[in-house]
Amino acid sequence: MIQSQHSQTARHALAETVVLAKARKNLSFAQLTEGTGLSEAFVTAALLGQHALPVDAARNVADKLGLDDDAVLLLQSIPLRGSIDDRVPTDPTIYRFYEMLQVYGTTLKALVHEKFGDGIISAINFRLDVKKVDDPEGGSRAVITLDGKYLPTKPF
């Protein structure tokens, strides 16, 4: 039976347990994703409390981390989503994304509407990918792909 969370408390606590177990076992999110049939971004988001995992994926990850049956059930529950409090993020990495949206949010909105019309980009029918590439000028660059289905506004 599908279960749904009414608060973020249980999933936040499980996320803390997951991060600690991951560190103790010296595992990467890529290693935890292996054998799930899902993307690294989706599994990572699920382990951090933002998605529900299918039963087989939940068991696979729980076995790798040494989590109990209650954790397997909780990993399958639909979370109350949203990881940023109702304030400006203070973590430097998350803040940079916030800053990007502050600077480019209206540009993204204008370009999406110009190319697609009135509507939104889905965060449900969505894919996320993060790649590290060499910068020709030295160092590394982050290539982040946000791939969401366009959903038009429908007059009623």
UniProtKB/Swiss-Prot annotation:
The keyword Lyase applies. It catalyses: cyanate + hydrogencarbonate + 3 H(+) = NH4(+) + 2 CO2. Its EC number is 4.2.1.104. The active site is at residues 96, 99, 122. It is an enzyme of class 4 (lyase). InterPro entries: Cyanase, Cyanate_lyase_C, Cyanate_lyase_C_sf, CYNS_N, Lambda_DNA-bd_dom_sf. Belongs to the cyanase family. This is Cyanate hydratase. It comes from Burkholderia lata (strain ATCC 17760 / DSM 23089 / LMG 22485 / NCIMB 9086 / R18194 / 383). The lineage of its organism: Bacteria, Pseudomonadati, Pseudomonadota, Betaproteobacteria, Burkholderiales. The gene is cynS.
